[in-house]
Amino acid sequence: MGHSRRPAGGEKKSRGFGRSKAAADVGDGRQAGKPQVKKAVFESTKKKEIGVSDLTLLSKISNEAINDNLKLRFEHDEIYTYIGHVLVSVNPFRDLGIYTDRVLESYRGKNRLEVPPHVFAVAESAYYNMKSYKDNQCVIISGESGAGKTEAAKRIMQYIASVSGGSDSSIQQTKDMVLATNPLLESFGNAKTLRNNNSSRFGKYLELEFNTNGEPVGANITNYLLEKSRVVGQITNERNFHIFYQFTKAAPQKYRDMFGIQQPQSYLYTSRSKCYDVPGVDDAAEFRDTINAMGVIGMTEAEQDEVFRMLAAILWIGNIQFAEDDSGNAAITDQSVVDFVAYLLEVDAAQVNKALTIRLMETARGGRRGSVYEVPLNTVQALAVRDALSKAIYFNLFDWIVGRVNSSLTARGSVANSIGILDIYGFEIFEKNSFEQLCINYVNEKLQQIFIQLTLKAEQDEYAREQIQWTPIKYFDNKVVCSLIEDKRPPGVFAALNDACATAHADSGAADNTFVGRLNFLGQNPNFESRQGQFIVKHYAGDVSYAVEGMTDKNKDQLLKDLLNLAGSSSNQFVHTLFPNQVNQDDKRRPPTASDKIKASANDLVATLMKAQPSYIRTIKPNDNKAPREYNQGNVLHQIKYLGLQENVRIRRAGFAYRQTFDKFVERFYLLSPKTSYAGDYTWTGDEESGARQILKDTSIPAEEYQMGITKVFVKTPETLFALETMRDRYWHNMAIRIQRAWRNYLRYRIECAIRIQRFWRRMTGGLEFIKLRDQGHQVLQGKKERRRMSLLGSRRFLGDYVGVGNKGGPGEMIHNGAGINGSENILFSCRGEVLISKFGRSSKPAPRIFVLLTTQTNRHVYIVAQTLVNNQLQIASERTIPIGAIKSVSTSNLKDDWFSLVVGGQEPDPLMNCVFKTEFFTHLTNALRGQLNLKIADHIEYNKKPGKLATVKVVKDPGASNVDSYKSSTIHTSAGEPPSSVSKPTPRPKQVAARPVTKGKLLRPGGPGGGPSKLASRPAPARQPMPQPTPQPAAVQPPPAPRPAVSPAAQPRPVPQPVAAVAAAQHTRNASSSSTRAPPPPPPATPPAAQRKPMAKVLYDFNSDQSNELSIRAGDLVQIVSKEGNGWWLCMNTTTSVQGWTPEAYLEEQVAASPKPAPPPPPPAAPRASPVPATNGAAAAVAAKAKAKPAPPAPPAKRPNMAGRKVAPAPPAAPRDSAVSMNSHDSSGGSGRGTPNSASNASLAGGLAEALKARQHAMQGHHDEDDEW
């Protein structure tokens, strides 16, 4: 229910999964529940409100203000208004289009605060409360005749049938049967009156039964107060029950032939009021709906035939006419009508004559049966007997139909809860009111009493009982009126009526006079007045005057034994079903009167309603003319007063909207507090009251929004309750989101892992084709040509199209188009180079060109493309195009130069070309010729300088030549190259980098496969134990100083990746002294025992290997020995890069750790060859000089250790690393335990100097040791 007068701050909040609750304001500026951010989109899409949709928001509470608001909304087609949970409905007398499926769906799963007032909202609330709280519900619809009670009941049934779910066929069948009861019971129980074209002339309480899933499994209907007198007579402009007009107008020919059915004008019971039609109602179509409804509820064709046989009998009984005979007694005027009635009832015609014209009288004496006399009836008495028979047949037939419907609607499963819908005709005040109006108004008084007890009195009584502070409201309790009618002591109206019937039962007039005398005893009651032949009862709806005449006869409600005997003599089994009771001729007890029956029925109804949680719909009739847009303020104001709407508004404004026992409240909302629940389980150990307090505290409900009673918690506004419901729904919604997030995280993690595997695989295998092509180039040269050092790099790949001639866009496309190369051709090779150009009278000189090699099925050429400037414009054109098949040979030298010639032998000179990627060109050309390339490698280059004139170009090795070849006078000067047998070096290992997280954001794994951060990332420095300041070491021993990053857990809680060099620098810094010039301190105290040093080895010879499990080392390096094998191989680790691998034992010399001495002498000046670790290029040069004097290193053992038995740390893969595991470590305790040893533990004075002396000694004696080994 959106309010246009909501104070600033009142917001709306949508609930998850279909239900929403609004956090609207309480009304004094406070906001119920937790404040929410206003959503402008919601406000902008809301329909503009007319007046106020809840009367509790009226600024002035009065009957006139309520009337004005209802009128304003009625004029704008807004017929529904709230009073808290009570719905006020004004009958529009026309179709507003507000009951369509689209409108129904808009109310599904919504609370009343977020949708406009509607009967669908009441139905949704009742259904939701039944499912959520497992309480039986009932909807009490009250109001006067013609106010729209029946329509409201039908819409509630429509909504519940639509939203109650259930795809099972039996459940759907139950829904269909429940909906089918409407047209069926309306046909037999509704009629046109002066005030209403479809007035319910009976009371109906429909109880829908549901299983634990909220699916309808059955229903039960209880009917009250059928107005059977309407069967035999109606006032002008009213009609009999609808079924008579439907049957007479639209009966099929079968029934017309069997039962003699004619038009309604032919029957007394349907023509007495001279009203045969209802505006806007098609009786024929309604009859088809009735027949269809009979089929839906399972009524067989035989049963339908019997029902219509009884209807025909009633119509024909009404046509029996009487006249006085010579004795003044009643005589039937047309025997043929009696004979047809006898045919329909399947009895003897003579028995019908006797039952209608003669009454059996029995005399008794001394308690014994006496004589039986046949007393003739006069015409008035005969007509009364005739009408009594018709009324009895129709009344019993209606009860049979209701019972038949209940039989079909019997629950087909266990019943958990129910929703009841009460539709009973409302308060009636006519010009002449009789016994029927008294009964109707009495039942409405009982319903009003329920409303007072459940909404007003019970409200205040509960507040007092629970010791809740609130302002009491005065109200009118109509219990005194109910007591006036139903009490026995002192006797009420019904008791006086029964006494008059028992005292003067023979004469109706005498009985009526006796009744008037009994009423005089009620004159002292302030709600009763007795007048001549009438009495007035002051009902809650107004004063009603009742006529005494005929009340006693109507109260007797006794079918003569003659008529019961007639029914008992029928050979029709259905008639026996309608009149099952056998006549007990000896029973002298007074049968129950009509007032006794209606009193018992009303009390049973009240007891049923009191067992359920009620919802109220108060219907209002805007005018007596059934006009669509007419609003009679006087009539509506009267209804507002007797419905007690003003008191209802006042009590609602002063009370609490929701109350619940502590245990049920905690059971419903314990999920909202982390102290009362964990993972969906109830964890509170205290009592229910303390648990309820904790829930309200943790949900931030203001203290003024609730009160704690003795056994219940009271919530002031519905907005607060809806906020709790919203939070409860959001709890499950959030749990679902967590599961979804975890699942999406898993999928993302799986995809990320697959991508990384694919990326690694592409990185490992994507360049294999280029590497294979490069290795093929070595075979093409046949080991006859020296190689350039850059050509043997491990990172060299034969990529082919270096200029990008085959690409779209860029300079390559310009060359492609300028040279006239077809776009569909396959570019094998393109590169920039030079061609030797000969000019007349001048020496030849190289000129830049672009070489393109392409092959297709139809075009296989070598293009030589020239770029020239013509008028300052770049011109690109193919200078020469050589078919690949025309190339007889390729001539090149055996030195490392880049010159070669394509020997064609045509009319043009052979091109002499200079290309840095010559080997790759030879390889592609070989493949294009399918291995038939004639490559000539000699000490010179041959080519046809002119057609038929073979020329040679010398290639000489010039030690003074630069790295760039030079051509002069048919001689090419080049420097020395790598040996012709050289092959490409292994692919270099990429630089080790920190691993990236496997996933991003707040997902499962923040780091590598282990879920932690990268070990290469910056970590807090380990706590250093206090130690004495070391003595300065020689510069030759100290590593170069490097800045050490200051890292602390508090300053950097998250590791930051750093380059390996930075990590290594930090390690070396810890190994060095902080100063080399500081004065020596006094002798230090005793130091703790030094940590055990890990075995180290010095590298004696260079060892290069392209195997992934072998470690390449350089002479003079120090490596850490991880393990030793007895087959000549040691597993070592490079202390700088933390890379492990196998190394020949003969290439290493294990270093013996010297024991620390207390005070070593200062070392002598360091000699150039005394450096312990050759860390600079200068030191490397010294080692190279020393290597010239040493013999060749020994060959590595032929057999390496079995790698399957030991896992060797692989070389770091290409950056970026996919794993968070790093072989580099800050200390020996981290990582895998094979990290670089931390020399900080040996940083004492004695240990440092001793290690320096030992290293210097080994360096000086290394040459002799090597000679001894070889």
From Swiss-Prot:
Region (Actin-binding): 418-500
Coiled-coil zones: none
Annotated SH3 domain residues: 1092-1153
Ranges of Low complexity composition bias in the record: 1059-1078, 1168-1186, 1238-1252
InterPro entries: Fungal_myosin-I_SH3, Kinesin_motor_dom_sf, Myo1_CA, Myosin_head_motor_dom-like, Myosin_TH1, MYSc_Myo1, P-loop_NTPase, SH3-like_dom_sf
Gene3D superfamilies hit by this protein: 1.10.10.820, 1.20.5.4820, 1.20.58.530, Kinesin motor domain, Myosin VI head, motor domain, U50 subdomain, SH3 Domains
Record-annotated Myosin motor domain positions: 50-729
Protein name: Myosin-1
UniProt source species: Aspergillus niger (strain ATCC MYA-4892 / CBS 513.88 / FGSC A1513)
Gene: myoA
